[in-house]
């Protein structure tokens, strides 16, 4: 199975731009890979929320929204599975979720982040987390997703360790300075990933509308046995295809 880690650019609050970026990559990689993986909250952008539910309920979308349907149609048309982060609205709650669509355009997994680090501490019950990890099948592989901070909790490592899968997908939004990631932080992530005792595919997005030194600047890697088996560095947009 070929998995392409898309460490590419997004714009906060520009869901149309981000949707078109996903669909453009689906078209570009038709016949070249089996799964395209994008980072956490890629569809709306990580910093798109105000933490006022009356405002944010119009930014978050349900998995049945037309924007999701458009991406499903592209996946079906180009026979390519895709997984991307989005800010999900379900009933009266908002989640940081990762949606995976197979190459027939069918949603096969909608994972809700279980750790609270995606939101500020002062939020009310409208901002929520999921409660468990799920195993799903794509092609001939069984897959588990953990979003960003999920994999830094011992309890979550234990939960995943009790589940059987071929690999773990680790979409994130991290805002390390790109030099810090390239020189030090990636090794800490490789070590943490080794606790899962299976290949872990990491991808971070690239923020196009914020120019601070400590902001998401891409980067993607295959971690296995505490090692970085393959990678593209942080600091510029890029994609890397991993064969599992």
Q: What are these model-derived regions, one by one?
A:
Residues 34-35, 143, 166-167:
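Structural motif
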Residues 89-163, 177-187, 244:
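Active-site catalytic loop in hydrolytic enzyme cores
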Residues 1-14, 97, 141-150, 169:
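Active-site-proximal beta-strand elements of phosphoester/diester hydrolases
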Residues 24-103, 175-198:
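Cys-nucleophile CN-hydrolase/nitrilase-fold catalytic domain and related Cys-dependent amidase chemistry
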């Amino acid at each position: 199975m070929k998995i392409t880690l898309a460490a590419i650019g997004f714009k906060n609050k520009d869901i149309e731009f981000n949707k078109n970026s996903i669909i453009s990559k689906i078209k570009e990689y038709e016949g070249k890979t089996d799964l395209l993986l994008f980072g956490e909250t890629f569809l709306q952008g990580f910093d798109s929320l105000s933490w006022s539910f009356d405002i944010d309920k119009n930014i978050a979308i349900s998995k049945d929204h037309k924007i999701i349907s458009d991406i499903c149609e592209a996946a079906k048309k180009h026979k390519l599975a895709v997984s991307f982060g989005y800010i999900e609205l379900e009933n009266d709650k908002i989640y940081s979720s990762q949606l995976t669509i197979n190459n027939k355009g069918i949603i096969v997994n909608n994972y809700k982040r279980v750790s609270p680090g995606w939101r500020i501490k002062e939020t009310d019950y409208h901002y929520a987390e999921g409660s468990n990890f799920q195993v799903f099948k794509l092609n001939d592989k069984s897959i588990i997703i953990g979003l960003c901070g999920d994999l830094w909790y011992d309890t979550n490592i234990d939960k995943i360790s009790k589940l059987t899968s071929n690999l773990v997908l680790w979409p994130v939004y991290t805002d390390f300075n790109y030099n810090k990631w390239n020189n030090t932080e990636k090794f800490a992530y490789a070590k943490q990933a080794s606790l899962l005792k299976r290949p872990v595919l990491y991808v971070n997005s690239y923020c196009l509308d914020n120019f601070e030194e400590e902001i998401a600047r891409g980067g993607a890697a295959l971690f296995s046995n505490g090692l970085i088996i393959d990678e593209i560095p942080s600091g510029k947009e890029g994609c890397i295809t991993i064969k599992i």
